[in-house]
Regions:
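Compact, glycine-rich, soluble single-domain proteins
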Residues: 42, 46, 53-99, 103
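Terminal, regulation- and interaction-focused segments at domain boundaries
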Residues: 21-49, 145, 149-155
């Protein structure tokens, strides 16, 4: 347990150091392929008891219409326990829920894991002081950090 208490903040710090936030999008570099990154993220959210509603492979969709797209996948997930308190602050937040994570490979072959910053969403909906946004932000940062961490994620 002491090891987890020591390692977890370091992993989170490393992930946040690599995070970029522009227009509310938090993007974290991944050392894994896009598929492996999304597989890891999906496993983590399922282990945390969240519902996975859909996993959308945009590259596969593009291929169906004769277009080429680098690996790009979206995971749609959530849980009323997290989303409802956010919507209690402003029901309009429902347009941005369930939560989504995007994993993509850029033109330089770097893989990224990105998500909308709940604090940005709270500001967008006029409830910047909503505690649920901060809680969701911490959870998403933790999930992202674990997904890109150099340790095994096992079912």
């Amino acid at each position: 347990m002491k090891i987890i208490q020591f390692v977890a903040p370091l992993v989170l710090l490393a992930a946040l150091t690599n995070a970029q936030a522009a227009d509310g999008l938090v993007a974290v570099k991944s050392p894994y392929s896009a598929k492996v990154t999304m597989d890891r993220f999906e496993l983590i959210v399922k282990e945390k008891g969240l519902n996975v509603f859909a996993r959308i492979d945009h590259a596969a969709g593009a291929a169906k219409v004769g277009k080429a797209l680098r690996p790009t996948e979206v995971l749609i997930f959530g849980n009323p326990q997290g989303g409802t308190p956010f919507m209690e602050c402003a029901q309009s937040v429902g347009i941005d829920l369930p939560l989504k994570t995007l994993v993509w490979q850029d033109a330089s072959s770097q893989v990224w894991l990105g998500y909308n910053d709940p604090m940005y969403l709270a500001q967008r909906h006029g409830v910047a002081d909503c505690p649920a946004a901060e809680n969701l932000g911490k959870a998403l940062a933790g999930f992202a950090a674990a997904a890109v961490a150099p340790k095994p994620v096992t079912p």
